[in-house]
């Protein structure tokens, strides 16, 4: 397509298609916010971790080592904490393709993230793998003081790299 600079996905599970899609095009391909993890990892001390929030941790965990390998982070599972939202009240609407009650879900996400930080004080960065979680990113940043990255952050990162810098000559 004319004017397309890259191909993006918005769900961590799209990482399963990263290599296939990359081979089909000459465009940059970034199918998941999980692809930001190699960039985020060097900001942390070796003892610190990245938490990946996902719609369903039971489904994501078995495939995460392969996804991390695709990102160049093979053998790095110990640097990640995976937390699922499958038990957050109201979040089941996502899996059921129903309307989500954001107020109900926000309360559950807050509790989940605060518990995560209490259980894992070594978590210093949050990556929202699920597209639906982006709506809660600002609140999570506010209550944790931690950086939060999601599908929008992933796309913005690439887009900013393609944008002209108005302060520099062409």
Question: What is the predicted function of each stretch?
Answer:
Residues 1-8, 20-22, 114-116, 122, ...:
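Metallocofactor- and cofactor-centric catalytic cores in central/energy metabolism, strongly enriched
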Residues 5-18, 30-36, 55-59, 129-135, ...:
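Gly/Ser/Thr-rich loops at beta-strand to alpha-helix junctions
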Residues 20-44, 141-159:
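Short, acidic/small-residue loops that bind anionic groups at enzyme active sites
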Residues 32-81:
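Long, charge-dense
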Residues 60-61, 65-120:
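Active-site rim beta-loop-alpha module in soluble metabolic enzymes
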Residues 108-114, 131-139:
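A C-terminal functional module that forms or caps the active site or interfaces directly
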Residues 126:
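Interfaces and regulatory segments of ATP-dependent nucleotide/adenylate/phosphodiester-chemistry enzymes
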Residues 129, 133-135, 149-170:
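C-terminal functional extensions of proteins
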